[in-house]
């Protein structure tokens, strides 16, 4: 599910504020929390005031899905069953699954929602009023032998826009994974964040199979130079054919396209694929190196900065610390300490300190 987003000192014109308490206290600026829901609605609430009723602190609410919202429990897009997909996902609603992204410079928020007419739509909203500024833009594209086609029966709901959105250097990155044997390819769409004009699209397996970008809901990572990092799930690994399943991939946007600048694939990649263990079961984490986590509990630390030209295989600087996957899952990296790794999951939150090298 989408994670809540915190916004400090958000100024909302009093005339646009819904809640009575918020109307008094937020016109000159207040802390806020933004929620995106599976019903396709995005809410902004005042965070610094305990409400008498939940609507007291409501700043604004914007319904993205309109009449096309998926009421899976009522009708269901999968063979008329009431299940969302082949895995019998029976969420009563299916709308905004991924975490949106906020651009404080432009005072805007971008989000993606699924609609029951077999389409994903991208929106740009005003952070102060919630009004739709750009969009909806239908997500679609093709690369190599793969096509992301809206309005194709049974196709789009097999694509999951689970990974959070990334904003880097004015570009918006939207990643997908697939959960059907016929539609498992991963996708990474790139848009101009201000206009929502599509710039390019990349697939980890353009002429192969699988390689979804799931990352447990994490967004792709970006470094100061604008390089983008993703982790891919089970899939074909054939770098000569531009296939990067079960890999940590470093991408660079240049000349209007995403190119692979480097990658790491574990030596047991074939085993990972056969056992559905997914190198890409978490998002990559940047500090001095790149940290990736796989489903059964191994991590790899990579020297990403050593590879600035061409496609190159990263070296593993440290691997072998094993944590049971059922007890810990890497999702985020607390700041400002660049050497602390946080793990969360069904057991108590824990942290490991990494030694300098």
Each model region followed by its residue ranges:
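Mobile, glycine-rich extracellular loop/lid and propeptide segments
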Residues: 1-290, 294-314, 319-321, 348-357
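Inter-blade linker and blade-boundary elements of WD-repeat/beta-propeller domains
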Residues: 325-343
